[in-house]
Amino acid sequence: MQITILGSGVIGVTTAYYLAKLGHEVTVIDREEGPAPETSFANAGQVSPGYASPWAAPGIPLKAAKWLFQKHAPLILRLTTDPVQYRWLLQMLANCTDSRYKINKTRMVRVAEYSRDCLIELRKDTGIEYDQRSQGTLQLFREQYQLDGIGKDIEVLRQDGVPFEVLDRDGCVNVEPALAHAKDKFVGGLRLPNDETGDCFKFTNALAKIAEGLGVKFRFGVNIKSLLMSGGKISGVETSEGIVTAERYVVALGSYTPALIKALGLNAPIYPVKGYSITAPIVDESRAPVSTVLDESYKIAITRLGDRIRVGGMAEVSGFTDDLPAARRATLDLSVTDLFPGGDLKAATFWSGLRPMTPDSTPIIGGTRYDNLFINAGHGTLGWTMACGSGRLLADLISGNKADIRADDLGIARYN
């Protein structure tokens, strides 16, 4: 089949790769000049299925109220005049119950675990390189109450068969030796040994080259204007270079997905939740991380990517903004200086990206009421973690193959 994919981030490119592997004729269209220059460009770098948890969780409304008054808060809410923002926030609040949390987390872990397995298989098949490490991730707790409160998460990990280790200070230093100088800054940690790390931007660009070798065509610098409809199905894509036609269409435009499909009567409550990162060259190996360390107090991930340290995190609900406030940079600097001062922060690059978040934190993967239109978007903070699994799952659904995991509860129908 001829299939057109809209979007060349990590989700769009992985989808293209898996469709091409199944023998389809694939074209990818994007307004940018190459793969992954936006949200996939400088994320935290972790592939962490075990930490796949909804932002909408019991207790979050109270925590969010407290964070409003903290200088280095992990969540920043900047209200706009856009009614879409308010509707999304209300939908998110509706998911902050025990029952919804369990449903949403189960779905997220299902996709994330499958995706990690797909990534490992892809790596074996292609030999792709992207500063990858398979040395687990460590969630670090600065306060005793944080360590005492992980019982619910451990229960879910145990039920899902995810290996884990609860570590004291010495145990944390054993897996991340550079923490020896900061033992007074934390009380313990939760380690997931099967998690991985890697540079999402490098991966996406390398996979795009591999996909080209399978026949995928990339059309960069092309603006997508609208989807055209005829006879109850999609008949083409109106672009700045004319109308593009295919037999099947995939929308993988992240936070920009809702605007494109709204005219078709489809509701995808995906809202941009802004994240920040800095990337610094390592100048002191003895004070740099081995893998990824999650600073629970600030919700920041500190990751080793080759000869660089990537520090990323926070969640800012402020609409489609791309500014780089000094206050956000200060929070990233504070966390990494406290724990891993082995990077040259003066030489660091500062970045922000718009994570496409659904109110239930679960991505939208699957078909629509239009037989030839599919969605792969809304992965929030876990786009890198879920990319390979999402791409392979959708490729199977489009091809009519039996999916490896349950997919009926991942589609847009849950909102329409």
From Swiss-Prot:
The keyword Coiled coil appears for this protein: no
Keyword Oxidoreductase in record: yes
Annotated GO MF terms: D-amino-acid dehydrogenase activity
Reaction it catalyzes: a D-alpha-amino acid + A + H2O = a 2-oxocarboxylate + AH2 + NH4(+)
One Pfam short name: DAO
Entries under SUPFAM superfamilies matching the protein: FAD-linked reductases, C-terminal domain, FAD/NAD(P)-binding domain
Cellular compartments per GO CC: cytoplasm; plasma membrane
Enzyme class: oxidoreductase
InterPro entries the record matches: DadA, FAD-dep_OxRdtase, FAD/NAD-bd_sf
A biological process from GO: D-alanine catabolic process
E.C. number(s) listed in UniProt: 1.4.99.-
Record keywords, A-Z: FAD, Flavoprotein, Oxidoreductase
Residues engaged in binding FAD: 3-17
UniProt cofactor(s): FAD
Similarity remark: Belongs to the DadA oxidoreductase family.
PANTHER family: D-AMINO ACID DEHYDROGENASE, SARCOSINE DEHYDROGENASE-RELATED
Task performed by this protein: Oxidative deamination of D-amino acids.
Name the record gives this protein: D-amino acid dehydrogenase
UniProt organism field: Brucella suis biovar 1 (strain 1330)
